[in-house]
Amino acid sequence: GRITILLREFGINSYGVDISQTAIDEAVEFGKHFGFDIKDGVKIYDGNKIPYNDNFFDFTISESVMDSMPFELAKKLIKEIDRVTKKYFFLSLISSESNKIFNQLENNKIFIDEIEVEDEHEKGTIQSFFNLEKIEELIKSTNFKIKWCEKHTLENVLNKTHHGRYYLVLEKE
């Protein structure tokens, strides 16, 4: 909901989907706080089909979403995003270097698989870690190609942990 609200602040017609009715209800309430009624603009995604027509969106955004699910589900979701998107797709994905911030993983290994988070933040959710090869695997069965890609890595200098995210713009050919 936060991106839907942000885009509306800029005067852009925006819509959102989520798998959780609770998240949608919270987004609607959050929107009211900023003076926006987004109730008609947010819908449930049933895990199979995004409830919008083909090429409905000029562009789509997925901020910190596709890495918070099993990789196989992300591959299914990106095909649906491909279906409803006319041209561009912006997404961010957690990088493999970020595994050191999760207590249950060994601190000296690069990890590109997925885990169930045990730490307080997002406890019980799936976290899937990415490198460029895994990103290419994610998009290979879509019409998207990487137009722009950056990886931002931050270091906590006190405990020497790193957190990184890929930021990508995908373009339909």
Q: For each predicted feature, which ranges?
A:
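A conserved beta-strand element that flanks and buttresses the S-adenosyl-L-methionine
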Residues: 61
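Carboxylate-rich, divalent-cation-coordinating active-site regions
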Residues: 52
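Class I (Rossmann-like) S-adenosyl-L-methionine-dependent methyltransferase catalytic domain
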Residues: 1-49, 73-76, 89-173
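Short catalytic micro-motifs in class I SAM-dependent methyltransferases
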Residues: 64-68
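Helix-to-beta-strand junctions that scaffold the AdoMet/dcAdoMet cofactor pocket
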Residues: 69-72, 85-86
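Class I S-adenosylmethionine-dependent transferase superfamily signal
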Residues: 80-81
